[in-house]
Amino acid sequence: MADTIWYTRCPVPTASGIAFQRDMFADEFDGSDYDVRNIKELGKEKADSHFNHALDNCFREGGSIPPLWAKQGGADTVMVGLTFLSDAICFYVRPDSDIKTMQDLKSKRVAVGVRPYIMIDFMKINGHKAWDCGLRAHGMTLDDVELVEVEINDDMHSHINPDPKTGEKPPGTLMFQNELDALNRGDVDAIWVKGCQTRQMERELSGEIRLISDLLYDTDNPELKVNANPRIITVSGNIARDNPDAVVRYLQVLIRAARWSADQPRDSAQILATELGVSLSDINGAFVENYQNKLWPNLSAETMHLLSTQQDFMLAHDYLPGEVDLASWCDDSFLRKAYERENLTWAA
């Protein structure tokens, strides 16, 4: 009987999502000692493993905040890859607002959604960092605005690993609905939204919100585009130690998915739009140009540096009680071997 490799992914563009939608894991591991399955099959009682990485034999690809938090807390994980894909980070006001630019936010109230029920409130950190970067990109700081917490009681666990094949849909603009409601009530003067939800919201709420800045276009500084990215590929320590070949084979699948995405950009865009629960036009306008060619796993010095800026922010604002040694957490031997087996140049 085959052992199970569990995987989990965030609702963002990932090679894991493409591989899952195209049955590439099944193709690679068919007839092997492993069966690759979605942690969603384990039910809600195991859903937190997406955040704390407490499940053995598990791979995760997604936002950087939970893996950093879990590792600092003692999770037995290995970082085996990174990707960096800039996405829209947008700031909106009401259409009748006298706020025209980011500089007009001086002394204004800006929304940060908070979810007290979740073990690591990554969206609060995302919001805090989005405002930090958005203001810095326009010569301001967090001291220039009032951060207003908007409490949210949704179910983030339901957003983990949606399976479009079964009709499940990712959260879409619902992830920012509470902040939007606060804006419309007048509780805050501005909100932030990221990723393909920006274009979806602009399309669905045309005339009801007004964009004042988008960091995808308003800054060339990659450090100011870091918001839950670089995405991290982590694996449970037990499988890295006990069956390194399985880790290499898993990464080979991600490399193949990244190559397919680069070679078939139109098909890739459609798969990712389905994966994220948005239209094709939404996804094509929400990410850096040629985003379909940005899913290659790597551990380059540049991407590692960008990850360090995410950690620095978390440390500075007490979201991490201590520093993760990124160099010792990272093991590039698996990814090097995977590229070698695929006869491709190591993407360092």
Model regions and ranges:
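Secondary-structure end/capping motifs
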Residues: 241-319
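Short, surface-exposed acidic
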Residues: 31-39, 140-147, 276-288, 321-328
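Pocket-lining segment of extracytoplasmic ligand-binding domains
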Residues: 65, 156-159, 163-271
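Short, glycine-/small- and polar/acidic-enriched structural segments
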Residues: 3-158
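Solvent-exposed, polar/charged alpha-helical surfaces in well-ordered, non-transmembrane soluble domains
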Residues: 27, 103, 129-133, 181, ...
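Short, solvent-exposed loop/beta-turn-alpha elements that line the ligand-binding surface or hinge
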Residues: 26-30, 217-223, 294-302
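Conserved C-terminal helix/tail region of periplasmic/extracytoplasmic solute-binding proteins
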Residues: 312-348
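Short glycine-centered helix-capping/turn motifs at secondary-structure transition points
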Residues: 18, 22-23, 186, 294, ...
